[in-house]
UniProtKB/Swiss-Prot annotation:
Induction record: By a variety of stressful conditions including bacterial infection, heat shock and exposure to ultraviolet light.
A Pfam family matched in the record: Turandot
Native source organism of the sequence: Drosophila melanogaster (Fruit fly)
GO cellular component: extracellular space
Gene that this sequence comes from: TotF
UniProt similarity note: Belongs to the Turandot family.
Name by which UniProt lists this protein: Protein Turandot F
């Protein structure tokens, strides 16, 4: 009897996981297209791109396993995110530091380029 219950539980779990995976595909595609529209478009200004960097980082953290990146690109991206967070967590007199968007943007630009290339490849597959 325990085997039947365990088997039923495993079937239910597999069904749930399959349904979850099927739902995430349209979400991944929609968010990937949104990131491409901002970071893959040369006509989008620098301010808009810098304003959308947190969304790109969130996208990368959520879907990094689905992006076809090299080990070197993945390591670089993780290091850049760590440095970005450290920069954003700096405080001056107890309040978050102001400005420095140019420094952060210069740091994240190669990261954004490699992620956008990975997104474009993932959408084509």
């Amino acid at each position: 009897m325990k085997t039947v219950i365990l088997f039923g539980f495993l079937l239910a779990l597999l069904g749930y996981l399959e349904a979850e995976h099927a739902q995430s595909d349209p979400e991944f595609t929609a968010k990937a297209r949104q990131m491409l529209a901002v970071f893959g478009n040369s006509e989008v200004d620098r301010y808009t791109k810098s304003r959308n960097l947190p969304a790109l980082i969130e996208f990368y953290e959520k879907y990094s396993s689905r992006l076809p990146l090299t080990v070197q690109d993945r390591t670089y991206a993780n290091n850049v995110i760590r440095r970005y967070r450290a920069h954003n967590n700096q405080q001056v007199d107890g309040v978050p530091a102001q400005g420095g968007v140019g420094v952060v943007f210069a740091l994240l630009l190669p990261f954004a380029v490699s992620i956008v290339e990975g997104i474009a490849k993932a959408i084509r597959e």
